[in-house]
């Protein structure tokens, strides 16, 4: 991939970031701490330099993220000085909702989707930017860069608007909001090339290291804390693994890998023919799981 292509993608994303600031009164960036969010954070810092980004960064904390993710989040906010908001669905916490006790579907709905809706309504955000890409998953592949949501934060594919010649329709009706995806046209390979080119810090979990994992539901699940029950017949193995995508640790599978640097990851990716989302259990709850979640208000 040429440097010119990366600069074109960068310019497009920065244009979208500035368009959102120019046309919405109270935007926010959804900061999930992953590699795409790290790229989006970097682009936001660039887009408005030397000023700080004129919007906050919202992390929806399910209380089940990898410990290294939370430490990285706090370090980035401290070092870069951006406005970090953290929201947790306290009702879900009080009810003891979790991936082991209630399953991935209910956990995701309560602790991610409902939590996000709560935060958007509490702060009155009218546009939420996120780092989703079209090459990740089929429902994301057909979503527009500016994706209108109804008053209940739901997505209706039939209401999508044409986007021609970088002319975006940013108007929303009463109660409606907009989800905006500046990285829509990036691929996973583009993301890693840009991380290398710009020397962007990312969570160490993306790099191969020896980690304690168990094989469950066909995936290698990392034992990140004492809350993870070890089922009969399971064995905790110390394996050289890394993560292509990051979410709640009980719902995110690792891959066997020796790739310990960004160039190593780029070389490894030349042999990969599957989406990183295949290692996220929430995408396989049922047929069309991601589209169903988006209709309910998910990212």
Swiss-Prot record:
It comes from the Bacteria. The keyword Transmembrane does not apply. Gene3D superfamilies: HUPs. One of its GO terms (molecular function) is ATP binding. Pfam families: PAPS_reduct (PF01507). Proposed to provide activated sulfate for transfer to nod factor. The keyword Mitochondrion does not apply. Keywords: ATP-binding, Nodulation, Nucleotide-binding, Nucleotidyltransferase, Transferase. The lineage of its organism: Bacteria, Pseudomonadati, Pseudomonadota, Alphaproteobacteria, Hyphomicrobiales. Belongs to the PAPS reductase family. CysD subfamily. Sulfate-activating enzymes, NodP and NodQ, may be physically associated. Its EC number is 2.7.7.4. This is Sulfate adenylyltransferase subunit 2. It is an enzyme of class 2 (transferase). InterPro entries: PAPS_reduct_dom (IPR002500), Rossmann-like_a/b/a_fold (IPR014729), SO4_adenylTrfase_ssu (IPR011784), Sulfate_adenylyltrnsfr_sub2 (IPR050128). GO terms for biological process: hydrogen sulfide biosynthetic process; sulfate assimilation.
């Amino acid at each position: 991939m040429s440097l010119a292509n990366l600069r074109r993608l960068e310019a497009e994303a920065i244009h979208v970031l500035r368009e959102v600031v120019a046309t919405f009164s109270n935007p926010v960036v959804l900061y999930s701490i992953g590699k795409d969010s790290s790229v989006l954070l970097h682009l936001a810092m660039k887009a408005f330099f030397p000023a700080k980004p004129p919007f906050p960064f919202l992390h929806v904390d399910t209380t089940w993220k990898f410990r290294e993710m939370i430490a990285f989040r706090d370090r980035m906010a401290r070092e870069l000085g951006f406005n970090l908001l953290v929201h947790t669905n306290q009702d879900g916490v009080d009810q003891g909702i979790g991936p082991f006790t209630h399953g991935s579907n209910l956990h995701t709905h309560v602790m991610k989707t409902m939590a996000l809706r709560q935060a958007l309504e509490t702060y009155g955000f009218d546009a939420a930017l996120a780092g989703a890409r079209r090459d990740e998953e089929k429902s994301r592949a057909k979503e527009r860069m500016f994706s209108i949501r109804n008053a209940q934060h739901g997505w209706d594919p039939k209401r999508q608007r044409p986007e021609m010649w970088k002319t975006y329709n940013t108007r929303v009706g009463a109660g409606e909001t907009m989800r905006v995806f500046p990285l829509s046209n990036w691929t996973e390979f583009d993301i890693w090339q840009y991380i290398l080119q710009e020397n962007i810090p990312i969570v160490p979990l993306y790099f191969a290291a020896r980690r304690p994992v168990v094989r469950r539901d066909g995936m290698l699940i990392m034992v990140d804390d004492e809350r993870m029950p070890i089922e009969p017949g399971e064995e905790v193995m110390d394996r050289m693994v890394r993560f292509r995508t990051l979410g709640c640790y009980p719902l995110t599978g690792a891959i066997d890998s020796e790739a310990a640097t960004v160039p190593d990851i780029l070389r490894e990716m030349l042999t990969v023919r599957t989406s990183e989302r295949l290692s996220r259990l929430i995408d396989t709850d049922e047929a069309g799981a991601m589209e169903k979640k988006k209709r309910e208000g998910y990212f």
